[in-house]
């Protein structure tokens, strides 16, 4: 990133959220603790014993947080990249998002990799420790459609904020 983008500010934020994706990502998008989401937005809360996807309402929770925070409509897109087709669409259309006040892109690859790392024998060997895991992640990023899309924005006037719901 350093070769293509100027880092104006680097901050770290910490929380007491559970590291499970279903809690942490919903909390990031809602701006609330899991217990507050359950209390105030029960229609978007999915309990552990329910078979429904636990992160199906990120967009709705983000919309609610924006309304609470800005108290006005903003031009926004939320893109959740869960497959190659969506990744290609994002890459092809990335410049269109420059007109937005906010564009949120969720890339599920790191989640998939972290879960597969403990379940698939080949990944257990390839990512046997943190150093190997980070190396695989870096290699993926450098060859990903996400990086390709970001490089198309080189020299454009926009702010990029990178966040994660993973501790490492």
Which residues fall in each region the model found?
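Feature captures the catalytic ectodomains and active-site-proximal regions of enzymes
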Residues: 1-168
């Amino acid at each position: 990133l350093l070769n293509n983008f100027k880092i104006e500010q680097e901050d770290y934020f910490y929380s007491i959220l559970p590291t499970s994706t279903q809690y942490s990502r919903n909390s990031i998008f809602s701006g609330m603790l899991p217990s507050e989401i359950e209390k105030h937005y029960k229609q978007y809360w999915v309990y552990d014993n329910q078979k429904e996807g636990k992160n199906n309402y990120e967009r709705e929770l983000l919309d609610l947080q924006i309304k609470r925070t800005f108290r006005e409509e903003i031009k926004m897109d939320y893109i959740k990249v869960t497959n190659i087709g969506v990744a290609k669409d994002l890459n092809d259309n990335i410049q269109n998002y420059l007109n937005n006040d906010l564009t949120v892109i969720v890339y599920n690859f790191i989640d998939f990799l972290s879960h597969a790392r403990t379940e698939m024998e080949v990944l257990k060997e390839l990512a046997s420790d943190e150093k190997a895991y980070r190396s695989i992640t870096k290699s993926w990023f450098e060859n990903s459609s996400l990086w390709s899309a970001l490089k198309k924005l080189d020299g454009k006037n926009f702010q990029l904020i990178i966040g994660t719901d993973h501790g490492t």
